Amino acid sequence: MNARERLREAKRIVVKVGTSTLVRTSGKPDFRRMDRLVREIADLKNAGREMVLVSSGAIAIGMDSIGLQEKPAEIPARQALAAIGQSSLMTLYKKFFADYGQTAAQVLLTKENAARHHQYANSRNAL
């Protein structure tokens, strides 16, 4: 069975979206692309699939929120941008998913969530 056939038969599909998919070269969110992505995910969910969206983009959305043009090199500054951008990104996802009758939720994971059995089990149950 090739990859396309496995995908057609999959009960659960994980979609990983990178920053360049969500943000235009200008640094502004690409609302049209986000809407198409969410519509496809909602259609698959309505067809009975379990859907998980893994999304990057919080730093870029945070940069746009405060008008910053260049990504800082310092980790604390990136963390601050991610904190700003994450809530904005989730607000966008919640709005787009609501347009298609779906509820968006957020689960924040770290490497430790996969490495430690009890954390892995809790994360899996949350999903």
Positions of PLM-derived features:
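Nucleotide/pyrophosphate-binding catalytic subdomain
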Residues: 1-127
